[in-house]
Every structure is written in structure tokens, then in C-alpha cells.
């Protein structure tokens, strides 16, 4: 087949648009006509069971939903402890303790629950009233002990000395 206008043999069958086009001059030479019977209907259809893949997708979706639910609950608890922490910082003594701990760099990287536990510990550490306070806020003493161990004994004494200096100034 050749182009009637330019005589070129470079003809392109554009099945997407249903046209026969000359690649040299770009003229549409003819339209492509399809038969009434589709090729997909003439062949035997093969049915593949996708239940395995569907089950796997459902399992992944459920896993993601459960993770998001648990994550929301954790965020709500964290928000509660942040609210408690902010309300405690209204008190002048807690504010001073927080400032000293912040200046020492101890509060960086800790969650609000741990910060709250440290504030309670440094406020009531001398008379062991902090254990009762920790129970009220559902803070485990073991977690507080781990944080205090990470801080170290020398640093703890330094912090207590700074807190005593702050209280002597007033």
C-alpha cells in the first residue's frame, strides 16, 4: 500500500485511533474497521482464583487499621499527660524544677509521661511522697528508676544542688 498523495510506502496503522496514516505527509489514507466479534470473546476465558491475593490484601488492611487505632489511643494518652504537665507548670516550684531539668538537657527526647514522673520525683524525692503521686498518674516506678539510672548519680546530685540553690534564693 502506498500514499496516494506523496507516493511513500511508509504507512502507519494507528489502531488506537482506528486510522491508516502516511508517516511522510501525515494524511489519513483510510479508516480501520473492526469486525463485530471481539477477539476476547472468541478465545476461551481462563478464570484465575485471586482469593489468596484478596485475603492477603484484607489482612494488610486490617493490620493497618488496628495500628492506626492503637496509635490514636497512644496519642490521646500522650495528650492527657501533656495537659497534666502544662497544668503542673503553673505552680512555681514545678516551674523551677522544669527549668533546671531543661537547662541540664535531661528532658530532651522524653515523653510527657516521663517528664511528669521526673517533676514529681524531684519535688517529693526527700520524703518518698512521690510514690503515691506516681500511682495517681499511672506512672510506673520502674520506668522512673530507668530514667534516673540513665541520668547518673553525679548528675543527680548536681541537679539537687542546683534545686537547693534555687530554693535558697527565694
From Swiss-Prot:
Keywords: Metal-binding, Zinc, Zinc-finger. A zinc finger (TFIIB-type) spans 1-30. Zn(2+) binds at residues 3, 6, 22, 25. GO terms for molecular function: zinc ion binding. The keyword Metal-binding applies. InterPro entries: Znf_TFIIB. Its cofactor is Zn(2+). Pfam families: Zn_Ribbon_TF. The keyword Metal-binding applies. Belongs to the TFIIB family. This is TFIIB-type zinc finger protein. The lineage of its organism: Archaea, Thermoproteota, Thermoprotei, Sulfolobales, Sulfolobaceae.
Amino acid at each position: 500500500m502506498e500514499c496516494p498523495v506523496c507516493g511513500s510506502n511508509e504507512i502507519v496503522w494507528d489502531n488506537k485511533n482506528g486510522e491508516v496514516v502516511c508517516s511522510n505527509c501525515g494524511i489519513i489514507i483510510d479508516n480501520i474497521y473492526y469486525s463485530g466479534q471481539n477477539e476476547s470473546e472468541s478465545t476461551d476465558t481462563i478464570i484465575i482464583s485471586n482469593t489468596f491475593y484478596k485475603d492477603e490484601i484484607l489482612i494488610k488492611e486490617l493490620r493497618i487499621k488496628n495500628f492506626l487505632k492503637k496509635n490514636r489511643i497512644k496519642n490521646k494518652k500522650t495528650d492527657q499527660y501533656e495537659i497534666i504537665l502544662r497544668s503542673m507548670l503553673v505552680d512555681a516550684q514545678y516551674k523551677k524544677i522544669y527549668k533546671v531539668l531543661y537547662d541540664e538537657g535531661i528532658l530532651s527526647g522524653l515523653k510527657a509521661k516521663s517528664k511528669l514522673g521526673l517533676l514529681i520525683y524531684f519535688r517529693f524525692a526527700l520524703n518518698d511522697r512521690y510514690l503515691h503521686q506516681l500511682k495517681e498518674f499511672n506512672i510506673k516506678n520502674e520506668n522512673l528508676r530507668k530514667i534516673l539510672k540513665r541520668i547518673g548519680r553525679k548528675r543527680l546530685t548536681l541537679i539537687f544542688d542546683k534545686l537547693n540553690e534555687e530554693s535558697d534564693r527565694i
